[in-house]
């Protein structure tokens, strides 16, 4: 999976909030990135990483990759549950963006990962995880947090951000250990 695809997705996500001229940026951000949309993105980001990580549990060629997939899946299930509990508490209906480019990126990532085997799968999965977590971290910091209105939703994003960073670094360490 190419890193540029995820970085482009993060930029596209940020563009949803900052696309118009500077004078209208705040109004556009609030219209494009309201809390129900942020809740939907938060849920999707966790669900997608659960899906790719569950694939690593079954397809990983090394114990390290399978274990990393298991940890990521477990962690993202817990974070997704926290998000869903908050959505219920706040009585919010998550509303995905109209043009959710990240969904197409996830579908492509799954195609790539499903077609890879052995060490090629391990490398593709780890590269995906590094790029994916970087894109999510960038989107949280540059777009989602600034647009979030509800204090509890903002608090949840801040609370889980270090785990996203730790996941990115863990995948990078394992990728580095694989060598070229």
Which residues does each predicted region cover?
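Bacterial N-terminal signal peptides
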Residues: 8-18
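His/Met- and acidic-residue-enriched segments that coordinate or traffic transition-metal cofactors
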Residues: 3-6, 21-180
């Amino acid at each position: 999976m190419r890193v540029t695809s995820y970085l482009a997705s993060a930029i596209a996500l940020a563009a949803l909030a900052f696309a118009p001229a500077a004078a209208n940026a705040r109004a556009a951000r609030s219209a494009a990135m309201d809390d129900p949309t942020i809740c939907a993105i938060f849920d999707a980001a966790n669900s997608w990483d659960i899906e790719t990580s569950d694939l690593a549990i079954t397809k990983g060629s090394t114990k390290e990759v399978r274990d990393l997939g298991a940890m990521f899946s477990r962690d993202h299930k817990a974070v997704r549950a926290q998000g869903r509990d908050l959505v219920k508490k706040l009585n919010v209906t998550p509303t995905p963006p109209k043009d959710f480019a990240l969904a197409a990126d996830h579908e492509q990532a799954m195609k790539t990962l499903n077609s890879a085997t052995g060490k090629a799968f391990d490398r593709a999965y780890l590269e995906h995880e590094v790029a994916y977590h970087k894109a999510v971290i960038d989107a949280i910091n540059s777009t989602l947090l600034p647009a979030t209105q509800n204090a509890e939703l903002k608090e949840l994003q801040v609370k889980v951000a270090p785990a996203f960073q730790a996941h990115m670094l863990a995948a990078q360490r394992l990728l580095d250990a694989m060598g070229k």
